[in-house]
């Protein structure tokens, strides 16, 4: 059981993969589930000024990367996937959908509710995932961003993406599916890894909805506004960052 805030779902997947690689397990059910919409949680996140107050238009309140974003919208749900070694999958007659090629995690302990503005901690996590997968940042075709729709958090992730991709940032479709689902906290990594897997499997990039005016500080990025898009995806990155400074990156690839 992983208890690492909003990165917990991705870390559960990463830990499951490590157990399989070490021989401790052949197959694992991994991801996250969360039922968090309750008075205590709402009061706590409200006190932290983390929640959107756009109550007049709740359907559009979750708006990552938008200049008018003002906090996240809490969501509930679950996302689980079965991971296993290729040998085990073949032995039971299963057809692999995608390959888990890279995973990395880090902690920066910068602040209880936000990462460092230079994205350093998250960058370390993604670089660890790239190293595990023997990939370079230039090989990533899509990013499912953590982007929760908070003013500070989205900017920190943008810094991470600039660190990783440099001048190539505009060539990589970056989606925040939290614009549609809200923020599922500990389940976020589970459900977003499934979005990422489907992007790899189907060569379709999910959109970032509610993005009407892109933040000027994020000029040059392609956030796939409004509508899904056909796009070849060989390797995709899924990010998950949690309160307290925990970071995780997961890379899913077409089956080789």
Positions of predicted regions on the chain:
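Acyl-CoA/ACP chain-elongation machinery
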Residues: 24-70, 103-117, 145-154, 171-221
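Conserved small-residue
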Residues: 9, 16, 45, 82, ...
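Stable alpha-helical structural segments in soluble proteins, enriched in small hydrophobic residues
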Residues: 12, 125-133, 164, 196, ...
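Condensing-enzyme catalytic core mediating Claisen C-C bond formation in acyl metabolism
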Residues: 56-133, 142
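Glycine- and aromatic-enriched membrane alpha-helices
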Residues: 154-171
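Flexible, low-complexity linker/loop segments at domain and module junctions
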Residues: 133-139, 170, 219-256
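Flexible, glycine/charged-enriched surface loops at secondary-structure junctions
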Residues: 95-99, 135-141, 171-173, 206-209
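Active-site-proximal alpha-helical scaffold in enzymes
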Residues: 3-34, 73-94, 183-205, 250-252
């Amino acid at each position: 059981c992983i208890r690492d805030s909003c990165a917990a779902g991705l870390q559960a997947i990463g830990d499951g993969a490590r157990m399989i690689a070490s021989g401790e397990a052949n197959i694992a059910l991994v991801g996250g589930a969360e039922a968090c919409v309750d008075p205590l949680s709402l009061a706590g996140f409200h006190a932290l000024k983390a929640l959107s107050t756009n109550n007049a238009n709740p359907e559009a309140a979750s708006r990552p990367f938008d200049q008018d974003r003002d906090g996240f919208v809490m969501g509930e749900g679950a996302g689980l996937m079965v991971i296993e070694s290729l040998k085990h999958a073949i032995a039971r007659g299963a057809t692999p959908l995608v390959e888990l090629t890279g995973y990395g995690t880090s902690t920066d302990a910068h602040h209880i509710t936000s990462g460092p503005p230079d994205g350093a901690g998250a960058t370390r996590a993604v670089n660890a995932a790239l190293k595990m997968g023997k990939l370079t940042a230039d090989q990533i075709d899509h990013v499912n961003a953590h982007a929760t729709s908070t003013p500070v958090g989205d900017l920190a992730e943008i810094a991470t993406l600039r660190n990783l991709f440099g001048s190539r940032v505009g060539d990589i479709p970056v989606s925040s599916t939290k614009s549609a689902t809200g923020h599922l906290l500990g389940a976020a990594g589970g459900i977003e890894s499934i979005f990422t897997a489907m992007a790899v499997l189907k060569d379709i990039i999910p959109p970032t909805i509610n993005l009407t005016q892109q933040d000027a500080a994020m000029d040059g990025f392609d956030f796939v506004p409004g509508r899904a898009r056909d796009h070849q995806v060989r390797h995709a990155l899924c990010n998950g960052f949690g309160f307290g400074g925990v970071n995780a990156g997961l890379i899913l690839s077409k089956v080789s």
